[in-house]
A protein has these predicted regions:
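Glycine-centered coil/turn sites that cap beta-strands in beta-rich domains
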Residues: 4-50, 59-63, 71-74, 95
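Short, acidic, Ser/Thr-enriched surface-loop or helix-capping motifs
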Residues: 51-52, 78
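Ser/Thr-centric signal marking residues that sit
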Residues: 33, 77, 101
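Surface-exposed loop/edge segments in extracytoplasmic proteins
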Residues: 55-61, 100
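Signal that preferentially marks extracellular ectodomain short beta-strand elements
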Residues: 72-84
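Methionine-biased hydrophobic packing positions in alpha-helices, especially
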Residues: 52-53, 104
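C-terminal tail/sorting-segment detector
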Residues: 6, 64-67, 82-108
Length: 108
């Protein structure tokens, strides 16, 4: 579960030091989980939940944010507000050309 997938689009590999996506807590979780992250620069932030097939389940953050420590919550629902089934999900932080993805487990 500690596997981290990171991808920086474009030539600038230094972006990795400007953003940090932490492990969600709790993990595994039952109904709610917190996702914390740090921005060292301001930017348009997206945090998206995906199923293991890469389908978007829910976008929980999509806004310009100032630098600092941040937290987002996911209540195990999709974009329509419907509960999702138990299983493994991915969550991704995107800021500019930076993208980092981690896994989480929903138990019911």
């Amino acid at each position: 579960l500690n596997e981290t997938l990171g991808k920086i689009k474009g030539p600038n590999r230094m972006l990795n030091s400007y953003y940090n996506l932490n492990d969600n807590y709790p993990n595994p979780f039952n109904s709610n989980t917190s996702i914390t992250y740090r921005l060292y620069t301001d930017g348009l932030v997206r945090i998206t939940i995906y199923d293991m097939l890469g389908n978007v389940i829910k976008e929980i953050v999509n806004e310009v944010q100032n630098s600092g420590y941040k937290r987002a919550e996911w209540n195990a629902t999709d974009n329509l507000g419907q509960p999702v089934s138990a299983g493994v999900y991915l969550y991704s932080l995107e800021v500019g050309n930076f993208r980092q993805t981690k896994k989480m487990i929903l138990l019911k």
